[in-house]
UniProtKB/Swiss-Prot annotation:
Cytoplasm as UniProt keyword: yes
Subcellular location(s) per record: Cytoplasm
Listed InterPro entries: PRC-brl_dom, PRC_barrel-like_sf, RimM, RimM_N, RimM_N_sf, Transl_B-barrel_sf
Keyword annotations from UniProtKB, A to Z: Chaperone, Cytoplasm, Ribosome biogenesis, rRNA processing
Pfam families documented for this protein: PRC, RimM
A Gene Ontology cellular-component term: ribosome
GO MF terms held by the record: ribosome binding
Record family assignment: Belongs to the RimM family.
Protein name: Ribosome maturation factor RimM
PANTHER family with a match to the protein in the record: RIBOSOME MATURATION FACTOR RIMM
Alphabetical list of NCBIfam families matching this protein: 16S_RimM
Domain PRC barrel: 101-180
């Protein structure tokens, strides 16, 4: 099964040529190039491949958050896509987006263990952006939950909490994160 990543949320139609307002969910607008294949589906469609409809990007104006798809050329057709999600395959995203040293795709971080001083605190189940800060939503390990700690807690993606991300070891080492868990 193809893994799909949410790129943005489609807003209202704009203009007479089928333009769509795009509320970007990605840190990589450079992926939205002419000729790139994307899919549109309801936002809850991650697991239902049959609900994805493929389109080709005609153009994207980042400054105006305007997306044009090749086969959508009227306001009426554009309105049919309002409030849907714009998705791209994980493979396509990784091919088009060049990461700098220390940058990661969200999809690579989900599932990693969160470790502090050789103690596993839990695993990342989701990443949320609140204001301008990314947060790891961490499901606490059962042995810590049994000690009365929270089942789920948030860790800001900041140097104060995140020491190192080791994809090859499938873990994120932290400092000060256990204090967040204890106070959750």
């Amino acid at each position: 099964m193809v893994s799909m990543l949410l790129v943005g949320r489609i807003g209202k139609s704009v203009g007479l040529n089928g333009g769509l307002r795009l509320h970007l969910e990605s840190d990589f607008p450079e992926c939205l190039k002419k000729g790139v294949k994307v899919s549109v589906a309801p936002l809850n469609a991650f697991s239902c491949v049959s609900s994805f409809k493929e389109y080709i990007i005609h153009s994207y104006e980042h400054a105006k958050n305007l997306l044009f798809l090749e086969t959508i050329q009227t306001p009426e057709k554009a309105k049919e896509l309002t409030n849907l999600g714009l998705f791209m395959s994980e493979a396509e995203s990784k091919k088009l987006c060049v990461l700098k040293e220390g940058e990661f795709f969200y999809c690579d971080l989900v599932g990693l263990s969160v470790v502090e001083e050789n103690e596993i605190l839990g695993k990342v189940i989701e990443i949320q952006r609140i204001s301008q800060t990314d947060y790891f939503l961490v499901e606490t390990t059962l042995n810590l939950v049994e000690k009365g700690l929270a089942k789920i807690f948030l860790i800001p993606y900041r140097d104060f909490y995140i020491q190192e991300i080791l994809l090859q070891d499938k873990k994120i080492t932290t400092h000060n994160a256990k204090t967040l868990l204890e106070n959750s």
